[in-house]
Amino acid sequence: MKLHDLTPAPGSRKPKKRVGRGPGGTDKTAGRGHKGQKSRSGAGKGPFFEGGRSTLISRLPKRGFNNVGTTYEVVNLAQLARVEGDTLDRTALERAGLVRRKDRPVKLLARGQVTRAVTVQVDAASEAAIRAVEAAGGRVVVTGADRQNAEQAG
């Protein structure tokens, strides 16, 4: 005996009734009764319907707001010494553990000193950070991806 030889015992599985297909399928109204919301196709009340009164969600007060300001993942100049390589982009910063949130743009700030010439590729950078990296012989490439994301979102 193999797996495909197994069948359920006779009478143990009742066939599905096809409603609305003649007298056996309880005929015309197919067990839905006459007219009304529940007789219609696709009809029914939503899970939060409360019989017509104001729902709980609309009775509770509004709270908070959506801040449209961009929240950055901040990387400071002093932290760049921990990252190996001459080109420091988002993936290099993520590997070094300086950037954790993938949904936020990266911004370079000027706290600390740069000890070597590096090329830093970030979404945004402060003017002081750009000056400090260029003074050390490196360069900062500002991609501005956060602006593109903001335009797409709003």
Curated annotation (Swiss-Prot):
InterPro entries: Ribosomal_uL15, Ribosomal_uL15/eL18, Ribosomal_uL15/eL18_sf, Ribosomal_uL15_bac-type, Ribosomal_uL15_CS. One of its GO terms (biological process) is translation. Pfam families: Ribosomal_L27A. One of its GO terms (cellular component) is cytosolic large ribosomal subunit. Keywords: Ribonucleoprotein, Ribosomal protein, RNA-binding, rRNA-binding. GO terms for molecular function: rRNA binding; structural constituent of ribosome. Binds to the 23S rRNA. Part of the 50S ribosomal subunit. This is Large ribosomal subunit protein uL15. It comes from Deinococcus geothermalis (strain DSM 11300 / CIP 105573 / AG-3a).
